[in-house]
Amino acid sequence: MDILKDKIRSEGIVLSEHVLKVDAFLNHQIDPQLMQQVGHAFAMRFRDQGITKIVTIEASGIAPAVMAGLELGVPVIFARKYQSLTLKDNLYISKVFSFTKQTESTIAISAKHLNAHDHVLVIDDFLANGHAAKALIDLIGQAGASIAGLGIVIEKSFQDGRALLESEGYRVESLARVKSLAGGQVEFLD
């Protein structure tokens, strides 16, 4: 997706050979026009899959997921990273390790929103080592729902997330595939 790659080049900041900061348009400040185009791109790639729900993880996956949900006409569920007074009974629960924050979190989805009749598209802002995706897949599996695939805004192709997911038979569609962040420069795969 050329417009996304251009945005990464112009506004992304390489913090290290493993960390790309995109808080100017994706995971702190959000560019609504770009997210609308991201949502459309995911909808076009998964339109014929019979998707009934989109699942993401709070917080940075919400904007692209909502835009894809709007395009596909389906609800969006975001896994919460902590339990609150309103999210405490009949939950699907999993653990996820955050590469960026270097912490483990418990995530949860209410069982009333996801069931075995659902065919799910997973959307997230980044794919690195696949830990967040695997935690979401675990939650979806607890519900007995099926998975159409994973839509990733930015993939760090130099990490093993894609290989892990594809080896388990999951379809992965990434809008921007980063080959390298070496020397403070973003290099794309395609």
UniProtKB/Swiss-Prot annotation:
Domain of life, source organism: Bacteria
Keywords recorded for this protein, A-Z: Cytoplasm, Glycosyltransferase, Purine salvage, Transferase
Reaction it catalyzes: XMP + diphosphate = xanthine + 5-phospho-alpha-D-ribose 1-diphosphate
InterPro entries linked: PRibTrfase_dom (IPR000836), PRTase-like (IPR029057), Pur/Pyrimidine_PRTase (IPR050118), Xanthine_PRibTrfase (IPR010079)
Pfam families: Pribosyltran (PF00156)
Any single GO CC term annotated in Swiss-Prot or TrEMBL for this entry: cytoplasm
SUPFAM superfamilies assigned to the protein according to its UniProt record, in alphabetical order: PRTase-like (SSF53271)
Binding site residues for 5-phospho-alpha-D-ribose 1-diphosphate: A128, N129, G130, H131, A132
Chain's role: Converts the preformed base xanthine, a product of nucleic acid breakdown, to xanthosine 5'-monophosphate (XMP), so it can be reused for RNA or DNA synthesis.
Protein family: Belongs to the purine/pyrimidine phosphoribosyltransferase family. Xpt subfamily.
Identification of the protein by name: Xanthine phosphoribosyltransferase
Organism field: Pseudomonas aeruginosa (strain LESB58)
